[in-house]
Amino acid sequence: MQVAATDIDQVFAHTTNLASCNLNSKILACSNDYFASADNLLTPTPSISRPGVFVHTGAWYDGWETRRHNPDPYDWAVIKLGVAAAYIHGVEVDTAHFIGNYGEKAELQATHAPEGSGVTDAQIADPSFAGWKTLLPASPCGPSQRHGWKFDAEISQTPYTHFRLLMYPDGGFARLRLYGHAIPPPAPAIQAASAPVEELSSALNGGVALAASDEHFTPSSNILLPGRGKDMGDGWETARSRAAGHVDWAIVKLGLSGSVSKVVIDTKDFRGNFPRAVRVHGLVAGAGGDGVPSADDANWVEIVKGDKRCQADTEHIFGPDDLTAGGEDTRVFSHVKLTLVPDGGVKRFRIFGRRA
């Protein structure tokens, strides 16, 4: 089902763009990228334009652009997800700033070849690979605009690891976005008491930012990304508040429900705009009902004791002694809420514990 450009963000609000280099996704191969690298398809930020800027091959473009006069029906690029596998609910092909040189049609194919399947990346990247399933048949694209499609239940409930984007007949696409949820790696076959501590909130494990009070500068989904990032642009920053008693908040659905043994809140790169303090609450599995929990739901319980003061450009680690439970909180949490007092920015929000 096609999704209007103005509705894409709303329709896929509770998903993650898994076709992002921030989530370790990468281009395995492409038919051609003479004018602009296929790697640009996976850039997490919107495409930019630099009119009048030329490089050796011609005009500079922030996207994937192939040479003219393709002798084949289409150009192609093969993408490997950075997560173990994922359920994909929809796709977006963005032709931003490609006007006289955009690809006229887009097609998306996928396959499931997890680690240990016996199918290698080299085999999948080969043009002769026959294991592709078409998720989106060749569909028209227009100049400098977002194009979205939502998949049916059969597709969105099937796991995939690799994708192939076809561009008819040649030209340029700015971005590819694959909206869905990461599937966590399977749990080790050991006793629960010996279960390893994992990052329950990570986008790599299926964590999703469901809602936030404010995302004026950057989205709350950034706080679930792996690593510490490169600059302030890949964290979450809210607008300045003026009202007394104001707080900002973000609600996260854990990719892995479980106990909590450690919380990390990182203000890396936030130096004049970090929050004065933070609070961390959780919802015990089943307590919040279906859908997106309200920020003022009475079922939120304190995970970290009280308000914790923050510092600039610092990774704040709250261990067992900082937890309200006085040690590992063995309740099974499904959601967590990070509150900024009164506002500001954080780079990462990490919940560590043992999956249920």
Question: PLM features: what roles do these ranges have?
Answer:
Residues 117-151, 291-324:
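Beta-rich interaction modules in large eukaryotic scaffold/regulatory proteins
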Residues 80-86, 228-231, 253-258, 328:
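Helix-boundary capping/turn motifs
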Residues 76-80, 85, 92-98, 111:
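N-terminal low-complexity, intrinsically disordered tails enriched in Ser/Pro/Gly
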Residues 70-83, 237-256:
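Short beta-strands within extracellular/lumenal beta-sheet-rich domains
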Residues 78, 90, 164, 251, ...:
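Beta-strand secondary-structure signal
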Residues 1-71, 89, 97-128, 144, ...:
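Juxtadomain low-complexity/linker regions and immediately adjacent membrane-anchoring helices
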Residues 249-269:
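C-terminal, well-structured subdomains that either form a transmembrane helix-short loop-helix hairpin
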